[in-house]
Amino acid sequence: MMRCENMQELKPIKEGKVREIYDNGDSLIMVATDRISCFDVILNNEVTKKGAVLTQMSKFWFDMTEDILPNHMISVDTKDMPEFFQQEKFEGKSMMCRKLNMLPIECIVRGYITGSGWASYKENGTVCGIKLPEGLRESDKLPEPIYTPSTKAEIGDHDENISFEQSIDHLEKYFPGKGREYAEKLRDNTIALYKKCAEYALSKGIIIADTKFEFGLDEDGNMVIGDEMLTPDSSRFWPAEGYEPGHGQPSFDKQFARDWLKANPDNDWTLPQEIVDKTIEKYLQAYKMLTGKELA
């Protein structure tokens, strides 16, 4: 076991909206906090157990998809980590990961038309520049999943949707001569992962309407899944039972929180406890349905 002379001195090297990342020499330790963000803003509430759901659900999907693409996970057992992370507050929320050179694209895949995609479709029949068939209803399943990349925003900024061609140009700035190759790999891996996981989830009673992946390159230049994977934070999960296109669907994700914030614009980014409780109830329900286990 690694020892830490003064456990209080360990500080994250990067703090995202929800995650804290610590340097562990040749690896990183990613801690999913109980913070919740909506509309790219960190809310004032914390949602107890949320961080553990994110970490353990990511582990579940990482294990399931190793046949498609490797991932950055090394361990979620804090006994494998420095002593600092063996405090109770880190239990279940921490993941030791390989260091990657992260690619500057958020890889969004949509299997159903909803949210901002539905708003765009109603306006001009497209989603992120992709022309879709006429006559779609809100929440309809798309003929095929569509890939709609975006740039990665700094905290406080908004991600910007871009076309596939723009993603090539964006990647080319960071990886000269590799823009098209990496853009195509990101698209193809994103859709392959979504198709496999959406089929599995549907067999467990959950529709994955859309989700977001992030990828990086390992030391050998191989593409690897990073960040989180198919969690209620990065995805829209709907119950398959009662699914009915033509309107919005109930969800197992933070849509509860989003809906309340939209309905209460003078909210000061603070949720009522009732909405916090309903949100974690949905997260835990989704975890149990997908994994067959209660969260420890």
Language-model segment annotations:
Residues 109, 208-229:
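Conserved metal-phosphate-binding beta-hairpin within the catalytic cores
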Residues 39, 118-119, 220, 234-236:
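Intrinsically disordered, low-complexity acidic/polar segments
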Residues 6-9, 200-203, 224:
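Intrinsically disordered, low-complexity segments enriched in polar/charged residues with Gly/Pro
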Residues 177-209:
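A long amphipathic alpha-helix within ATP-dependent nucleotide-binding catalytic cores
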